[in-house]
């Protein structure tokens, strides 16, 4: 029969991997640049978790007053800007969404199936800090989730196999991105030779 998948919101923000040991937190980009001092909101989110040692995968994104995502350039400027971080934070606050749990208090979770890592993440993180995620085997439910997220201003969805181990730094075959297709039907009105 149909296989259950996680239908995750595709966020157009800054992908982050966050390492915490006690009160010390380090935030890295996908290319392993450390941006800890530029994203205090991410640090605070992770310090709020009931864990001593944790490694998480997530996304930091700027939302507008209505909770809709800002263009990527707005989010991206947070790590590039030379402005004082308190000013930036007031101008463009970031929201942290966590989508995977890779290590927890001495236990590496990388080889566990995604379903188990996601369940443990949901037990650890407050509900508003986990990426919007629907687990379903029903294509119609997945379609409705996709439509709702696109209507809310997001890029689309990422479908994730629930039996897959973690693949660092790249989307494996276990992840499929789905975005709306924007097509144009055009009629040729004028042809100029020459």
Task: Tell where the protein language model's regions lie, with residue ranges.
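Catalytic cores of nucleic-acid ligases and guanylyltransferases
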Residues: 1-194
